[in-house]
Amino acid sequence: MRSHEWIDRRSLALHEAVATKLEAEPHLVNIARANLQRWLTTNSAAVLREWRQILESASLPDLLALLRSSSEEAARLRQSSPFAGLLTPEERRAIMSRHEPRRP
């Protein structure tokens, strides 16, 4: 598997876990909103503004679908995800260990 494919799969797995957590606790989306607000004070990257628009306008089901999507658009957005800090270190470690690159 090429390295970018592995990275995309790992990112998707992390965001699937984020989506599952948001289903149970929708208020956690405020972590992403706070991250974006903080990041936008020093970086006006278009993708951050795009995430802000998504978080302001998307319904929870639409947001969850985006986080779980394997589309190129979703993969592009996940590269600048505002969901840092939503998973606990233990949750993140468990996912990372399951998605380590395979050695030839």
List each model region and its residues:
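Basic, alpha-helical nucleic-acid-binding regions used in initiation and control of genome expression
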Residues: 1-104
